[in-house]
């Protein structure tokens, strides 16, 4: 029983990694040259039954870094006007200092030793986040430098679809395409999808794994 209770702690679910769901909106596809315009970060928590859920979300509009490229097609797609003063945009550095503070606090509270980015098509978001952190010369990032959890891959395995909107609907998660391509909306839907997949795997008996010692005991009894 104690082993099962221990497995229900977040620190043991992903080998000490604290999952942080992230979505970014950008002014193009090139993380080195194109502006990061919006970021949302959803922190997760695990209940006493070992079920994963949303804790809270941070959201920032970002000022384009100096010399950043702004692709017109990307701006038309996400509907962001970087010059609009009503965005209340902050610098990359200010945003990431707040993100680091919140992530490290939640990571510590969960007894995890590092955080790992969860995102839909995670290589894209991870690339922009990593490049922004590098530009800001921020040290001691809580995020793993290359490992991620990609919900496109996980959804393809667990649900049979890789498109965020369709995967959410198939999982019973409401999705409004009119709200899509907002970092705030997309990260919370991605978080719900990730939690659904992790919790579904648990309810189907995939977690916790049978302890090695228990397996050996069963073999000896046979």
UniProtKB/Swiss-Prot annotation:
E.C. no: 3.1.13.-
Cofactors required: Mg(2+)
Annotated protein name in UniProt: Ribonuclease T
Signal peptide range: none
Cellular component aspect of the GO annotation: cytosol
InterPro entries, alphabetized: Exonuclease_RNaseT/DNA_pol3, RNase_T, RNaseH-like_sf, RNaseH_sf
Site (Important for substrate binding and specificity): 29, 77, 124, 146
Cofactor note text: Binds two Mg(2+) per subunit. The active form of the enzyme binds two Mg(2+) ions in its active site. The first Mg(2+) forms only one salt bridge with the protein.
Domain Exonuclease: 20-194
HAMAP family from the UniProt entry: RNase_T (MF_00157)
Gene3D superfamilies: Ribonuclease H-like superfamily/Ribonuclease H (3.30.420.10)
Gene expressing this chain: rnt
Residues forming coiled coils: none
Annotated keywords: Exonuclease, Hydrolase, Magnesium, Metal-binding, Nuclease, tRNA processing
Described function: Trims short 3' overhangs of a variety of RNA species, leaving a one or two nucleotide 3' overhang. Responsible for the end-turnover of tRNA: specifically removes the terminal AMP residue from uncharged tRNA (tRNA-C-C-A). Also appears to be involved in tRNA biosynthesis.
Subunit (UniProt): Homodimer.
Example GO molecular function: 3'-5' exonuclease activity
Active site: 181
Residues given in the record as Mg(2+) 2 binding sites: 23, 25, 181, 186
GO BP of this protein: DNA replication proofreading; tRNA processing
Residues reported to bind Mg(2+) 1: 23
Family statement: Belongs to the RNase T family.
């Amino acid at each position: 029983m104690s082993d099962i209770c221990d497995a229900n702690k977040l620190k043991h679910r992903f080998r000490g990694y604290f999952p942080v769901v992230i979505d970014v909106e950008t002014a193009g596809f090139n993380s080195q040259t194109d502006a990061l315009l919006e970021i949302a970060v959803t922190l997760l928590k695990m209940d006493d039954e070992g079920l994963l859920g949303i804790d809270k979300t941070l959201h920032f509009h970002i000022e384009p870094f100096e010399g950043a490229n702004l692709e017109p097609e990307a701006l038309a797609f996400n509907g962001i006007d970087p010059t609009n003063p009503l965005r209340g945009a902050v610098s990359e550095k200010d945003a990431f200092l707040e993100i680091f503070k919140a992530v490290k606090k939640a990571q510590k509270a969960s007894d995890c030793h590092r955080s790992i980015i969860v995102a839909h098509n995670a290589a894209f978001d991870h690339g922009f986040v990593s490049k922004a952190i590098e530009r800001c010369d921020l040290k001691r990032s809580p995020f793993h430098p290359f490992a991620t959890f990609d919900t496109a891959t996980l959804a393809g395995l667990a649900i049979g679809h890789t498109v965020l909107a369709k995967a959410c609907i198939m999982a019973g998660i409401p999705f409004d395409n009119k709200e899509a391509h907002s970092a705030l909306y997309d990260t919370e839907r991605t978080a719900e999808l990730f939690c659904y997949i992790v919790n579904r795997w648990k309810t189907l008996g995939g977690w916790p794994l049978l302890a090695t010692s228990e397996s050996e005991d069963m073999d000896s009894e046979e």
